[in-house]
Design a protein with these regions (language model features):
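A short, structure-level motif marking secondary-structure boundaries and short turns
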Residues: 1-2, 7-9
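Intrinsically disordered, low-complexity regulatory regions enriched in serine/threonine/proline
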Residues: 2-3, 56-106
Length: 106
């Protein structure tokens, strides 16, 4: 199973100097970006350490990670709306903070 974040950032190179302008905060371990979405129901947490990007979606009602976004078998209008909103966040980060890595291996 491929995670959505891995698909979005495949063959992309992160440009560190663009991260702060986008809203990432520098931390001891790297960079972190947090943003609420879907009217504050969810929190996207994106981290970058050693040029590797990782992300999680937290359901703010329960405080639990909303893992359903990465399970293709999970379908329905609600989970699809969460996926779409999260993908929009990831796509914006990729567009504004990365460049294409033309010769990267898959």
């Amino acid at each position: 199973m491929t995670r959505m974040i891995d698909d979005v950032f495949k063959r992309k190179t992160i440009i560190p100097k663009r991260l702060s302008d986008f809203g990432f905060q520098k931390s001891a371990a790297g960079y972190i970006y947090k943003t609420e979405f879907l009217d504050g129901a969810f929190l996207a947490v994106i981290t970058i350490q050693n040029n590797k990007i990782d992300g999680h979606v937290i359901d703010l009602t329960t405080g639990d990670e909303y893992f359903q976004i990465n399970v293709p078998a999970m379908q329905g209008s609600f989970v699809n709306s969460v996926r779409t909103a999260y993908q929009k966040i990831l796509n914006e980060i990729a567009e504004k903070c990365c460049q294409a890595a033309l010769f990267a291996s898959p």
